[in-house]
């Protein structure tokens, strides 16, 4: 199946700024999140498609490559947030390197060919963990420098000779027509050395596979789509080359009480109709405990109370957002005979003496409508 345009996937224009991209991603990710759509394979695929589009369009370099070359410009970049671990790289440089591979029959990566690959890890957090920050331990399956040969790839004590093909330079020059290109030596893979006796532990690669535990400090205020970069924590480099980086993609799980909008939180609070009518004190939940709000007599259903500073601390601004509590009248069910009797008495006693501002406003609007329609 053909890959859809990433701007179409996120339902944004090609001129959308970073804020619009992030806002649309949050909205769509919340709608198609697998936790909200259990047993719905199409929603899961849509969520993966949305995540892949956001990974490209939220990165300025990847977006530039995508805008110019389409999907071909970003095909080397690995999976989206749902891909777990994956190799990094890709982007603008790969487009041109592919041209050289076609012309000269090999890769062109320059002198940095021994650098380890980047890794990606998807980290799931609860809303509380994302809001307050947390130190987590993650297990990374990756390659590490061989402890026996210390990354050289050679058996300890054995001789390592200069490569005869490149004369120990690690590079060869290839000429075709008007083009002259320097590329890593295919004989020694750019190292300039030839191993006569490979290390028995790593078989000459200088790296071994292992799982390692890594402590990660997640800053307070992160949100779905945010990315944490840890320099040098990716794959080990080949034969002593520099290690790649580790990119931790954050995904915040849906919450039972709160919905997040940037640094603000929204919460629906059920309230008894007697409290709304007569007023009183109400306890509402916050991320750090309980808070009390005063309900004025006659408060209408749908009223919103804003608790300043009870939202989430911005990861960059360091300012706390607000908590918006929307009051919703809860109509009682399964009334006893006595309760029904009291309500009937209340209705009889009310008559025209009790004011219902929303009802009166609605009927006035309805009357105007009927008059205009001649009904």
Swiss-Prot record:
Pfam family for this entry, one: DnaJ_CXXCXGXG
CXXCXGXG motif-type repeats, residues: 146-153, 163-170, 185-192, 199-206
Annotated Zn(2+) 1 binding sites: 146, 149, 199, 202
Domain J: 5-70
One annotated GO molecular function: unfolded protein binding
The keyword Glycosyltransferase appears for this protein: no
Chaperone listed as a keyword: yes
Localization annotation: Cytoplasm
UniProt KW keywords: Chaperone, Cytoplasm, DNA replication, Metal-binding, Repeat, Stress response, Zinc, Zinc-finger
Cofactor: Zn(2+)
GO BP term, example: DNA replication
Main location: cytoplasm
ZnF bounds (CR-type): 133-211
Cofactor, free-text remark: Binds 2 Zn(2+) ions per monomer.
Free-text comment about domains: The J domain is necessary and sufficient to stimulate DnaK ATPase activity. Zinc center 1 plays an important role in the autonomous, DnaK-independent chaperone activity of DnaJ. Zinc center 2 is essential for interaction with DnaK and for DnaJ activity.
Listed PANTHER family: CHAPERONE PROTEIN DNAJ, DNAJ HOMOLOG 1, MITOCHONDRIAL-RELATED
Function field: Participates actively in the response to hyperosmotic and heat shock by preventing the aggregation of stress-denatured proteins and by disaggregating proteins, also in an autonomous, DnaK-independent fashion. Unfolded proteins bind initially to DnaJ; upon interaction with the DnaJ-bound protein, DnaK hydrolyzes its bound ATP, resulting in the formation of a stable complex. GrpE releases ADP from DnaK; ATP binding to DnaK triggers the release of the substrate protein, thus completing the reaction cycle.
Protein family according to the UniProt entry: Belongs to the DnaJ family.
Protein name as annotated: Chaperone protein DnaJ
Source organism of the structure: Acidithiobacillus ferrooxidans (strain ATCC 23270 / DSM 14882 / CIP 104768 / NCIMB 8455)
Gene: dnaJ
